[in-house]
A protein has these predicted regions:
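Short amphipathic alpha-helical "recognition" segments used for binding
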Residues: 6-7, 439, 444, 600
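Positively charged n-region of N-terminal signal peptides that target proteins for export
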Residues: 1-4
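Extracellular/oxidizing-compartment recognition motifs
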Residues: 22-438, 447, 463-464, 482-488, ...
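Active-site core of glycosidic bond-cleaving carbohydrate-active enzymes
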Residues: 444-459, 463-794
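Bacterial N-terminal signal peptides
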Residues: 8-15
Length: 794
């Protein structure tokens, strides 16, 4: 039987420590300290959910709508809305969209949002409206705990508090089909909504509330009733919002409509079976489309381009509907011959990024619920007996990443690559660093490390990284490993190497900010990870072995993973080295000595077994106990990163790594566009900026032209919005500026600007101690400006 956390763990969770387990030996001695961070107004609110049944009954793929009216004699100067929902909400006040939330998290310490909504209020009658969704199942960003609900409190000071309770009017949105197909293996379900039943005007004042529940028709629960034992502040800013119109109509066409197209659970499958090729190229900029009447048994299709990958909430303004028209939308990032969009609904991740609406009569504006990322949208219309005007809009909804860093260069290709990288980072920064907004929206931690580096240059913001560190720490395997992404149900996505990456991001945070706090807060998680790896050592070699229970990632390529893989052991060594430094910095001297001894042991094993007689790094010990004869680029790079004794970097560099960068040799394990970041960092540090620069200009050129970075170099069937390959966002500035951080928190730097790679550039680093500016004008030597608080070691 599960027991509640001890008071120490509870307080640690409230004040920023780890919350990594839910079974304890000692019951809680409850104290108000546990809920000290919960605003008093929110403590007075109730969790609410419309009946039938209790607030955990029959909620699979469910939407609910809530309305609360109140009057004001005057608009208060400040009106703080505290709000959360399980799983997610959209908030409107007086018909205007306010925000979406909460951030992903765990019910045992559920996040709530805080927003000043005074600008949305008015004298007289006011309306709070919220739409809430719960998938009723797990996804790659949500762990279902058997409950759904809305909790809010609007604190207006002397004007009073409006809170969620049984006075709120609510109803299940029965016009939303419940048995729709998932968007993908990783995400929730398609939204199919019949607007004849679900009037979008419900968010406005004056709407008739006939048929809405109130009082006995709403289930309620105390704010801290299980599973919501504790709460935490969002810890990151609310999303930034703006409306983006469609940019152009790419193509259009028409065809037969499948006979049973009125009753489908997977709109992506329907569209695919009907055919997605379009016959007429259009290529015109426009903000809306006009659909001619469609004959019975026929459909008309339109391929819309938003100009580049966008992320947010799809909105549709409809004019001239007679009621009953069906509009299916399928989202994609690219199209093929005959304007056929990428729609692999039955392969891989089973990506079926589609929605459906059935129109009501008249003119109206409606919006779908799920945040979605895409560039192209196929709009398929059927059953329209009269002309129909459709205006698609995207409400951008993403982390408000500020442009504090600057990269301007005279090379047009380099500039486009950098801007594509920056844009990719922005569409992959939501309530967490996500791999791609397209098919997953999962907080993969190998990706997140690269994204943090990107963000350090683009904005200098570390809050997404800090929140992500805690999120990963909060979901562990009993043996100490963390999950590859979190929160999640994906037990097949436990990646031992990503647990080591998580440790390295503790160091990254320290190196960027000078703060050791995350390491101190999560040291118990670190100890669990190290315990796992020590238990996985081969007694003969002292090297870490492959564990077939888990997915050992290492790289998206043919690198050795079974036996005793070199790359895994190198990552373990690097983690131990960084832990030793952090322990010394935080005065954990006994632990520092322990980690130092463990590092010394694994370093000796690597030198003995993973460096061959010629001084090259090999890929590992094979399952049969023999040494591999393969010398991957990854192994050479990691041996250099770890300064392994006996490794001949000059030989490996000249015969393997540089020939690869120059395109002179092929290799058995080509570094992916993700893992290339480690190649680039290592070779730039070794003085080979030119080779890295030219490699990026060649291999990222297509990405620069497209406007965002791909999952890998071959864009075919791959995501076109993958931030793990957006590292030119910081690598290109490093190459040209020659800025190298040499002290934690940017306390010191060295600068050696390029004088030959480009004639003109301007680069600005937004460090915690002020901006570093490196600028080169045509025909002149570079100039460098460094804040007085940063020690220049030139």
């Amino acid at each position: 039987m599960k027991k509640l956390p001890i008071i120490i763990a509870a307080c640690a969770a409230v004040f920023g420590g780890t919350l990594s387990a839910d079974t304890y030996d000692t019951p809680v001695a409850e104290s108000e300290l546990i809920w000290a961070n919960v605003p008093d107004a929110l403590k007075q609110a109730k969790w609410i959910w419309p009946t039938p049944g209790s607030w955990g009954y029959d909620i699979t793929n469910s939407y609910a709508a809530f309305r609360k009216t109140f009057k004001l004699d005057a608009v208060p100067r400040k009106a703080t809305m505290y709000i959360t929902a399980d799983q997610s909400y959209r908030l409107y006040i007086n018909g205007k969209f306010v925000c979406n939330g909460p951030a992903r998290g765990y019910q045992r310490s559920w996040p709530f949002d805080e927003i000043d909504v005074s600008k949305y209020l008015q004298k007289g009658e006011n309306l709070i409206a919220a739409r809430v969704y719960n998938p009723g199942r797990h996804t790659f960003s949500y762990v279902f705990e058997g409950r759904a609900g809305l909790l809010f409190a609007l604190d207006m000071g002397k004007a009073g508090v409006v809170r969620s309770d049984s006075s709120v009017q609510a109803r299940r949105q029965t016009g939303c089909r419940r048995d729709t197909a998932p968007y993908s293996v990783q995400m929730a379900n398609q939204e199919h909504i019949d607007l004849r039943e679900e009037n979008p005007d419900w968010i406005n004042l004056g709407f008739s509330q006939k048929g809405w529940n109130k009082g006995a028709g709403t289930s309620t629960g105390e704010y801290n009733a299980m599973p919501y034992y504790m709460f935490e502040e969002r810890g990151i800013p609310m999303n930034g919002y703006r409306e983006i119109p469609m940019k152009s109509l790419v193509a259009e066409g028409e065809g037969a409509s499948i006979a049973d197209s009125f009753d489908v659970r997977n709109a992506a499958e329907l569209v695919s079976k009907e055919g997605m090729k379009l016959s007429k190229a259009v290529g015109k900029e426009m903000s809306s489309i006009t659909v001619a009447p469609t004959e019975k048994g026929r459909q008309r299709s339109y391929l819309i381009d938003f100009g580049k990958v966008v992320v947010g909430i799809p909105i549709f303004k409809i004019e001239g509907a007679n009621g009953g028209e069906i509009i299916d939308t399928v989202m994609a990032e690219y199209y093929k011959k005959d304007f056929e969009i990428d729609n692999p609904y039955n392969t891989g991740s089973m990506r079926a990024l589609a929605n459906r609406m059935v129109c009501r009569k008249g003119d109206f504006t409606t919006e779908f619920f799920a945040l979605q990322g895409f560039r192209y949208m196929l709009v398929r219309v059927r059953n329209n007996s009269a002309e129909l005007k459709i205006t698609p809009i995207m409400r951008w909804a993403a982390y408000p990443l500020e442009d504090n860093g600057e990269f301007k260069v005279s090379n047009e290709n380099a500039q486009k690559i950098w801007e594509a990288s920056r844009h990719t980072e922005k569409v992959c920064s939501l309530d967490a660093f996500v791999d791609t907004p397209l098919r997953e929206q999962a907080q993969w931690w190998g990706d997140a490390r690269v994204q943090a580096w990107n963000t350090f240059f683009i904005s200098g913001d570390t809050r997404l990284l800090r929140r992500g560190i805690r999120s990963i720490a909060s979901q562990q395997v009993p043996n100490g490993l963390t999950y590859g992404h979190a929160p999640t149900f994906a037990h097949s996505c436990i990646l031992p190497d990503f647990s080591l990456t998580w440790i390295l991001t503790l160091y990254d945070y320290y190196w960027q900010t000078g703060s050791i706090e995350p390491f101190v807060s999560h040291k118990n998680v670190v100890d669990g990870i190290i315990s796992y790896f020590e238990n996985m050592k081969d007694p003969r070699t002292g090297l870490v072995k492959y564990d077939p229970r888990y997915w050992l990632f290492l790289d998206w390529t043919g690198i050795q993973k079974e036996g005793q893989p070199a790359i895994l052991n190198h990552w373990y060594l690097q983690a131990l080295d960084k832990l030793t430094q952090m322990c010394r910095q935080s005065n954990y001297l006994v632990d520092a000595k322990r980690y130092e001894n463990l590092a010394r042991s694994i370093r000796a094993s690597i030198a003995k077994y993973l460096i061959d007689s010629e001084g090259y790094a090999i890929d590992g010990i094979l399952p049969d106990g023999k040494s591999s004869n393969l010398r991957s680029i990854q192994a050479q790079v990691m041996a250099k990163m770890n300064s392994v004794e006996g490794f001949d970097f000059e030989k490996a560099k000249n015969n393997i790594v540089l020939p690869y960068l120059r395109g002179e040799i092929k290799t058995h394990a080509v570094p992916s566009s993700y893992w290339a970041v480690y190649v680039f960092k290592t070779m730039v540090d070794a003085g080979h900026q030119k080779e890295v620069y030219n490699f990026i200009l060649k291999n990222w050129k297509e990405m620069g032209e497209y406007g965002s970075t791909f999952e890998n170099y071959d864009a075919s069937k791959m995501s076109h919005s993958h931030a793990w390959s957006a590292h030119p966002a910081f690598i290109l500035p490093d190459i040209l500026s020659g800025v190298k951080q040499t002290g934690a928190g940017w306390s010191s730097v060295s600068v050696n600007p390029s004088t030959t790679l480009e004639d003109e550039y301007r680069i600005v680093y937004p460090t915690p101690r002020g901006k570093i500016t490196v600028e080169k004008k045509a025909g002149q030597k570079p100039t460098v400006m460094i804040p007085a608080s940063i020690n220049s070691q030139n």
